[in-house]
Amino acid sequence: MKLAIMTKPTFFVEEDKILATLFEAGLDNLHLYKPNSSPIYSERLLSLLPEKFYDKITVHGHFYLKEEYRLAGIHLDDNSETVPNGYKGRISGTCRNIDDLRMMKKKYSYVFLGNIFNSISLPTATSCFTMNDLEAAAKEGLIDKKVY
């Protein structure tokens, strides 16, 4: 089982130290998720982390950071995002229905299911899947080690 963590959407004091500690403790995959933020702040956070962890970091948005810091890959948060022209590397994505899951599993290295539950912090972000949806997808073999 791989340990994957998504950052808080906002930056906070000593975030770099906490992330470095998580990597030292065995974190396999960090998703750098800082929507609506200037890329300079993500660059600053990355520059504070030891380079040996860069190949375990997947970036949401600001896709140029993948090449600049030799990160693990990019993540597409929704269907409106596209893979940058000429991009070669690991791609993951978030799907919000079973049809998207079928399609994304064929194209991406791995997929997040979002949202499984109603969000506590974002009241408008409600669950996208019912228990029946998830059980049917599991029976169909759609939910496996490539689905988080």
Language-model region placement:
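Conserved N-terminal beta1-alpha1 strand-loop-helix module at the mouth
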Residues: 1-75, 79-109, 144-145
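Active-site/ligand-binding-proximal alpha/beta "capping" segment
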Residues: 109-148
